[in-house]
Amino acid sequence: AKPAKRVAVTGAAGQIAYSLL
């Protein structure tokens, strides 16, 4: 579980959630 990968996934999810808002 590389931190960079987790950040990338979180960032993508955040962008999607923001778009839905």
Curated annotation (Swiss-Prot):
User: What reaction gets catalysed by this protein?
Assistant: (S)-malate + NAD(+) = oxaloacetate + NADH + H(+)
Which positions are annotated as binding NAD(+)?
11-17
Which keywords appear in this protein's UniProt record, sorted alphabetically?
Answer: NAD, Oxidoreductase, Tricarboxylic acid cycle
Identify the EC number(s).
1.1.1.37
Which branch of life, at top level?
Answer: Bacteria
What top-tier enzyme class does this entry carry? oxidoreductase
| Positions of disulphide bridges | none
Question: Which GO-annotated molecular functions does the record name?
Answer: L-malate dehydrogenase (NAD+) activity
Statement: the UniProt record of this protein carries the keyword NAD: yes
The answer to whether keyword Oxidoreductase applies is yes
Any Gene Ontology biological process? tricarboxylic acid cycle
Give the similarity note: Belongs to the LDH/MDH superfamily. MDH type 2 family.
Q: Please describe what this protein does.
A: Catalyzes the reversible oxidation of malate to oxaloacetate.
Return the protein name.
Malate dehydrogenase
Origin species, per record, is Burkholderia cepacia
- Encoding gene, per UniProt annotation: mdh
